Structures are given as C-alpha cells and as structure tokens.
C-alpha cells in the first residue's frame, strides 16, 4: 500500500463533440500498469445539452499520442440481460452537478459480484458508456449478459426503464 506510482495524463484534440483525455499509470520501475482514455463533452447547465459554443472557446495544449492506439467506441446493445442487482443512489453518489458520477457505476457493478468471485478474478479491461444522466434517487436495475469472462452490463432507472449506462468488464 505504500507503493509510489506515476500518473501521466494529457488532452487530445476533440473527436466530433467529444473531448478526449488519455491516462497512463506507471509502477515505480517504469512499467506501464494501466492505460485509459476518457471522452467527455461540455453540457449547457440550463438546457442539459452539448454546448458547442463552450467547445469553441477551449484552448488546450493538445497531444496527439493515443495511449490505447484508438479512440473509444460505444458499446453495442445486447439482448438477454439477466437481473444482477438493484441499487438506490445515495447522497454521496451525486457529484457537483447533481448527477451520478460515472465512477459510481463501476462501484455498483463490482459490488454486484460475490467476494468469492473477486477472490478468483481480476479485471483486465473496463469500459463504461454514459448514456443518460441519472439525477434521481429512485431504484436502478443493473442487468448483466455473460460471454465467458466478458460481462456486459446495462443500468436502467427501474420506474421508466430509461437506459443510463452500458459497461463491459473483462475478467481474468
């Protein structure tokens, strides 16, 4: 728990409406331990829609290096999801903008497994696609579709069946 790691991050030029940011995490010996790319967009607080004007006003020192070698692509829809968990967002799940933060979805997914599963498996790859903002504290249904050790997830507001996120976790 006392290891010192190095995290490097840099912005890449936007791809359409999305801004990209790459991350590289290195162990003390310089070995790459993890790599990630996030995509995000500016949202107008009043309309809750992408803000193209704000995008034009951003001036960042972009780096064209892609740590993954490709841009993130959306996960495709699957059928045959089985009910995995039901969760209720708590106050601490909401961010400054009063919606559930993407990192909370990963926690919900991981918490839906037994401790025995976690003792036998480690995540190899995680992908999370934000679909619709979650701003209520109602019940969220999490469904899972398994293909070997590749597990696909979707989270929906139970009351309206509104799709909030899709995710993929590959285990080893």
Model-derived features: where do they sit?
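HotDog/MaoC-like acyl-thioester-processing domains
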Residues: 1-74, 134-136, 145-172
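Hot-dog-fold acyl-thioester-processing enzymes
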Residues: 33-37, 44-124, 172
């Amino acid at each position: 728990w006392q290891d010192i790691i190095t995290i490097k991050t840099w912005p890449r030029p936007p791809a359409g409406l999305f801004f990209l940011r790459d991350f590289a995490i290195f162990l003390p010996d310089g070995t790459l331990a993890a790599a990630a790319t996030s995509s995000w967009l500016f949202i107008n607080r009043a309309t809750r829609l992408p803000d193209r004007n704000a995008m034009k006003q951003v001036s960042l020192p972009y780096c064209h290096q892609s740590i993954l070698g490709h841009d993130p692509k959306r996960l495709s829809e699957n059928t045959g999801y089985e009910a995995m968990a039901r969760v209720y967002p708590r106050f601490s799940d909401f961010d400054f903008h009063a919606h559930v933060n993407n990192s909370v979805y990963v926690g919900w997914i991981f918490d839906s497994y037994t401790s025995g599963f976690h003792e036998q498996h480690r995540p190899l790859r995680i992908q999370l696609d934000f679909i619709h903002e979650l701003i209520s504290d109602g019940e969220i249904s999490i469904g899972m579709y398994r293909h070997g050790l590749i597990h696909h997830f979707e989270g929906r507001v139970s009351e309206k069946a509104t799709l909030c996120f899709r995710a993929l976790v590959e285990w080893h």
